């Protein structure tokens, strides 16, 4: 069959089914097709299709290889196109030995560093990779305070190593509506979770 390589951003809902009536179709995505990828959109929209996935090397593996970070205990998160708070960043880092973040030019290294400093997680270490595999590739590592004013690279992943992770028990996560005053919560759930964790309660 003739293979057509299509740019995923130009696909409409009707183009793929029409093309598959006569052709095989290849969709190219960058990085790991099974992690925050367009593959999930295609699979969910067309569950009956016979799809063969050919994996590539993702940016998390590339970053880990640069700094010798193994991923057995890693937690994976994303600031790219997803809602987050400084508290949610800190809450993830507090609980895990290693936390990976997908970043963007708008939300990335600077926001992670500021969140870690805000929640007194200065004993952590940040590992940053930008433009990995490109000629403009750059990597950095250091304490969070070194990156609080850093510019956010557009193509970037960040890992944070926490030497003293502590799981946060379910009892910590009382909902915000348990702390209402005049119809508004007095504190945020993420703030309460990190404070209790830092107090070792």
Placement of each model-derived feature along the sequence:
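Class I S-adenosyl-L-methionine
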Residues: 1-52
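A contiguous loop/helix-start segment that scaffolds small-molecule binding in enzyme catalytic cores
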Residues: 2-3, 8-11, 23-25, 94-184
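Short, acidic/turn-prone active-site loops that include or flank metal/cofactor-
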Residues: 2-14, 57-59, 76-83, 131-133
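Generic structural signal for well-ordered alpha-helical scaffold segments
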Residues: 17, 43, 90, 196-200
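Class I SAM-dependent methyltransferase SAM-binding "motif I" and its flanking Rossmann-like core
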Residues: 30-96
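Conserved alpha-helix/loop element of class I SAM-dependent methyltransferases that forms part
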Residues: 186-201
């Amino acid at each position: 069959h003739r293979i057509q390589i299509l740019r995923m951003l130009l696909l409409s809902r009707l183009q793929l089914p029409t093309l598959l009536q006569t052709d095989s179709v290849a969709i190219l995505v960058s990085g790991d097709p099974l992690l925050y990828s367009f593959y999930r959109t295609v699979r969910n929209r067309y569950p009956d299709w016979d799809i063969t996935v050919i994996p590539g090397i993702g940016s998390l593996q590339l970053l880990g290889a640069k700094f010798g970070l193994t991923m057995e205990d890693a937690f994976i998160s994303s600031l790219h196109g997803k809602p987050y708070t400084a508290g949610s960043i800190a809450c993830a880092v507090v609980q895990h030995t290693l936390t990976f973040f997908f970043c963007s030019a708008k939300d990335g290294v600077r926001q992670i560093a500021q969140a870690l400093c805000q929640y007194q997680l200065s004993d952590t270490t940040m590992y940053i990779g930008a433009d990995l595999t490109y000629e403009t590739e750059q990597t950095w590592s250091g304490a969070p305070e070194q990156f609080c004013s850093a510019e956010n690279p557009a193509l970037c992943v960040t890992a944070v190593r926490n030497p003293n992770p502590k799981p946060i028990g379910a009892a910590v996560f009382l909902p915000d509506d348990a702390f209402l005053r005049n119809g508004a919560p007095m504190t945020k759930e993420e703030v309460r979770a990190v404070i209790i964790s830092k107090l070792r309660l």
